[in-house]
Regions:
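Acidic, polar-rich N-terminal leader regions of halophilic archaeal proteins
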Residues: 1-140
Length: 140
């Protein structure tokens, strides 16, 4: 799956970069939030001291913002997408045409990794497909 940005997502991406100084790799606009994927190593700039950068962007765009740190390594990327769940291990396996990321999380964080109505793991699946051609993310 490739990355196609809507005009609205492009606008939010530009606003986020301008307000935080962080390099943004992707932006997805959902019904209840905006998801920003920043380049590796850009989380500090994106969040800002005590979350001030994210809070300023949320006020400017009048929406909740979730920031995910990008990664060149598919396993690291999937773990980042499931944050704040404590991911213990990720194995990315390809069988035939299908690539699946199997994720082990701390037992206490299984609900966090799934999220309300499956939102967190659903977002991880979407991002993994957009950035690393991973077809599915499953909790092991």
């Amino acid at each position: 799956m490739g990355r196609t940005l809507t005009d609205r997502a492009r606008g939010y991406l530009t606003t986020f970069e301008d307000m935080t100084g962080a390099a943004v790799a992707d932006c997805i606009v959902l019904d209840d939030r905006v998801v920003i994927v920043v380049d590796p190593g850009e989380m500090g700039a994106a969040i800002g001291p005590d979350g001030t950068h994210v809070q300023a962007v949320e006020s400017a765009i009048d929406s909740t913002v979730k920031v995910v740190e990008g990664a060149d390594d598919p396993a690291r990327f999937v773990a980042n997408a499931l944050a704040p769940a404590a991911v213990e291990h990720v194995v990315v396996s390809t069988q035939g045409e299908v690539t699946v990321a199997y994720v082990e999380v701390a037992a206490a964080d299984r609900g966090v990794a799934i999220g309300r109505d499956g939102r967190t793991i659903g977002l991880a699946r979407t991002l993994a497909a957009r950035h690393h051609d991973i077809d599915d993310v499953q909790l092991a």
